[in-house]
Amino acid sequence: MKVKELRDLTDAELAKKIDDSKDELFKLRFQLATGQLDNPMKIKDVKRNIARLKTIETERKLGIR
């Protein structure tokens, strides 16, 4: 998702996205450890997405945007 689309989400939807992304990261790490992961770059993408979501969450708490 684009950052603009993420900013349009409600706080509850944002929290849900963060939880879903963390679950996905856990599954990807497990696949990496067992040698089943086809694309290791997927881990990097998910981690960046989590960082984006947390940044938006922090901005809202601080009233920056």
UniProtKB/Swiss-Prot annotation:
SUPFAM superfamilies named in the record: Ribosomal protein L29 (L29p)
The entry's keywords: Ribonucleoprotein, Ribosomal protein
Recorded GO MF terms: structural constituent of ribosome
GO-annotated cellular components: cytosolic large ribosomal subunit
Gene Ontology biological-process entries: translation
Family annotation (Pfam families): Ribosomal_L29 (PF00831)
Highest rank taxon of the organism: Bacteria
Translocase listed as a keyword: no
CDD domains: Ribosomal_L29_HIP
Keyword NAD: no
PANTHER family, A to Z: 60S RIBOSOMAL PROTEIN L35/50S RIBOSOMAL PROTEIN L29 (PTHR10916), LARGE RIBOSOMAL SUBUNIT PROTEIN UL29C (PTHR10916:SF0)
HAMAP family noted in UniProt: Ribosomal_uL29 (MF_00374)
Protein family membership: Belongs to the universal ribosomal protein uL29 family.
Stated name of the protein: Large ribosomal subunit protein uL29
Lineage, highest ranks first: Bacteria, Bacillati, Bacillota, Clostridia, Eubacteriales
